[in-house]
Amino acid sequence: MTDPSTSSRTGHASLPESPFIDRLGAQLLSAADGVSEVVLPLQRDHMNTWDVAHGGVTMTLADVALAMAARSLAGDGVGVVTVEMKVNFMQPGRGELRATGRVLHRSTTMAYCEGEIRDSEGHFVAKALGTFKYMRRLAVGRDITRQRLRSDPAAKPGPSD
């Protein structure tokens, strides 16, 4: 995801541009003050072999909701990346999935979040916990070496690189 727009942090629904999330069809209803709500009307492409929401779709929706809750507390130009996430699946999701996210605790660099997903009947589909790191958008892949300043350009990357 890219940096959040001003409108998403002031309560107007707008997800940051992300080709994967755009294709999924998730819609941000709100994200402000550490709380978010995201919906996904399930389509045939979202289903598993039993004709219910695929677990990966459910996990992605949880990730988006938790990340948007965390991002709603960030300043301009700051986004989040998922450090870890755990999802417990309670029952199959059908119809429209609605995910809520909430920041439990925020430090200078991290946000600890929780969320839940319910279906259009109000059934409890999943519970999620996640940790997110605040950061400015960085170059990735091959471009990252241009971003880092090393005293020895031939030095091998360390464990945190």
Stretches with model-predicted labels:
Residues 1-161:
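Terminal targeting signals and extreme-terminal segments of soluble enzymes
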